Amino acid sequence: MTLILLIEQIFNGVQYGLMLFLMAVGVTLVFGIMRVINLAHGSLFMIGGYLLMQSLAWTGSYALAVPLAFIASALVAIVLEVIVLRPLYRRGPLDQVLATFGLTLFFNEAVTVIWGREAIPLMIPPLLSGAVEIIPGAVYPVYRLVITGVAIVAGMLLYFLITRTRIGALIRAGSDNREIVAALGINISLLYTLVFALSAMLAALAGIMMGPLLSVEPGIGDPILITTLVVVVIGGIGSVRGALVGALMVGLFDTLSRVLIPLVFTTNATSALVNIAIYVLMAVVLLFSRTGLFAAHRG
């Protein structure tokens, strides 16, 4: 493998890792505050892609379609939290897992009924369809660089929200001890709705940005969800910092393994080795730390 190819794959790995971070931090926030493992999180990724496609059909402009899809995704999440999740907060973890898994099945069938089973390709915005030379001899797509930049900005805004605002203080306090937050007279129901909407917006943002790179189709969020859960386990359940580190680890490890493993192993099992690479990484991390790299400590 040439140095140029290695550099390009590292860029791909970082971009993929940052997308996984947007997904994983949403799962982390929901679990940290609401104590719910949301198995419907991948569906929110899928919904973001479909809403972008529909918004493009209505407006014909990415400048209008992207914010429209983003806002619509947040509204879907608010309705979902109020109607479906809110009655489950006092139920056991099994009920919550079954309910959110049922939502995944529901959304997969719903988009099939509305838009059909066929994969729907989305065009990359013409303004971002070119490529730039990142180093002499290495050309990289502009759109992937934009995705990386947007994900970094989103992460910085999230960091500012959590560490520098009143809402962020409530999120951090609720993550440590939600009983005390409730005792202080804070509207926990509203806090839950805001947290779930924020997590859904991050997942939808990932789906919106990945839509032009992937064909939008029913179930597109399912494999993303599985990888996201691997990221959360590696980083530590409930840890935002762990979500970032775990996402970058998985993104780089998965991307580079798909290039390096076929160079080392030329057997029929090569594809299987590539597919299990991130699970091997997860097993190694758990071997040394049963709670992940940065497990959150709760009061």
Question: Which residues make up each language-model segment?
Answer:
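Helix-loop-helix "hairpin" substructures at the membrane interface of multi-pass membrane proteins
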Residues: 16-17, 137-221, 240-246
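Hydrophobic core segments of alpha-helical transmembrane domains in multi-pass membrane transport
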Residues: 49-54, 70-76, 103-111, 150-159, ...
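Short, non-helical or kinked segments that cap or interrupt transmembrane helices
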Residues: 27-49, 90-95, 167-170, 188, ...
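Transmembrane alpha-helical segments in multi-pass inner-membrane proteins
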Residues: 60-62, 66-71, 193-203, 207-208, ...
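Transmembrane helix-bundle core of multi-pass membrane transporters
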Residues: 88, 93-164, 191, 263-277, ...
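Membrane-embedded helix boundary and interhelical linker motif in transport proteins
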Residues: 11, 33-79, 83, 260-268
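Alpha-helical transmembrane segments within multi-pass membrane transporters and channels
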Residues: 60-103, 110, 245-250, 254, ...
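Membrane-interfacial amphipathic/re-entrant helices at transmembrane-helix boundaries
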Residues: 1-22, 51, 59-65, 91-97, ...
